[in-house]
Each structure stands twice: as C-alpha cells, then as structure tokens.
Amino acid sequence: MTFNNKLVDKILEAIFPLPEEFGVILQDDEEIEPVDFSYVQEAVVDADPDADVYFGMSKLVICSPHLGGVVIKIPFNGFYYVDEETGELIWNDFTWATGSDNSDYCLTEFEKYKRLRTYGLDCFVAKTFFYKVKSGVRVFIQEEVSSMNDLYQTRKPSQKSSDLVKKWREEGKVHMDSEWVANCLDKYGKSKVERFLYYCANIDPDILEDVHGGNFGYRKDETPCILDYSNYSD
C-alpha cells in the first residue's frame, strides 16, 4: 500500500509523546468534563490544516485527503470511569483486547486482518498494516473507507442478492445490515460470502461484536468492507 509516509511522520512528530493515560471516559455524565483531545487536534491541524481527528472508545483515528487514501490509527491504552461513591474519575488499563496484547485494540485488528488474509477473506475488511512504534506506542495504517453512517446513499444491491439475504436472516445466518451483505454478494459472490459468514460464526465469532453503522461501509471503488473489527467491548 502506497501512501504519504512523510505526512504521516510529520503528524506523528507533532502529537507525540502522548499522555501515559491515553483514553476516554467510559460513562456519560453531564457533570463530568469529557477528556480533552483539543491538544491532539491542534497539533494535527498544525501539521496538516486539512486533517481531522476522530476517536471512539479504543482508538484515535486521523484522516486527511493528503495522506494518500489511508488513515492513521493510534490505540488508547485504557479508559476513565466515574467512581459511583466519590464521583471522581478513575483510570483503568485495557485488559480485554483479544489479540496478543490485551491492552491494544489496534494490534488486535491488525492480527485479525492477517488471519483473514490466510483464509482468503481479507476483501471483507479494510487493509490494516503496522507502521512503527513511536514513543513506545504502536501506530497502524489502514486504507480509508467511508462508513455507512457517513454515506448519503449506497449502491442498491440486486433483487436476487437481497432475496437471498432475507432468507439467510430468517435462518439466523445474517446479523449485519442486509443491504451491505447483499452488496457483498454482488461484489464477491455467494461462495465467498458464505465462507465469510462461516468464518464469523465458527472461527472468529467475536469479529462482529462491535460492528455497527459506523464500523462498516464502502471503499472508494464501492466495494463493501468492515473498517473497525477490533472487537471492542465494555
């Protein structure tokens, strides 16, 4: 995968080192200020004025039209929660990621990608690669994908594929967005989709644990794929 590695390095140089406790608040509470990531946003924009910073529960994602069709993913190493008795913010390290390092969901995602490649099923997920270690933190690069939540409209699948997905859903074989699965059928064929569904059900059943509208979508060439498959769970 080719991308603008000079800009990646410039952005990383701007935001590192990161705080030792790098994560978000697990619970929503109107009286608790959210974790302030403005310093990261400001540093990223200083490096690239067109860049944006997004974050979920397990990772920070940096996007820019100048990165060359990729995003930068940086893992959080834990989270804050609100002590019910004192109301204080308490830090807790991640310990339940399912990869070889149970504190790093980006590494989990990368290892899942490598495993899917060995099964010839990597077309269903965004390409993910380890980039480097920066100040003791692993940094990953992933191909840029538009999530279902960000798309105004998506390609309408064929009626044949839609009917088959409806049948599979009635049989309990499909638990994802029906239109997305039907588009997978149109793009990848019935045999490969059946293999992927079997893989998800029997080989890596937690891969779809956290798949929602923000975690799966379409590449620029309109092929469907999952863009966050690290299996975050609280």
Regions found by a protein language model. Give the residues of each.
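Short, solvent-exposed loop/turn segments at secondary-structure junctions
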Residues: 67-68, 77-80, 133-135, 145-148, ...
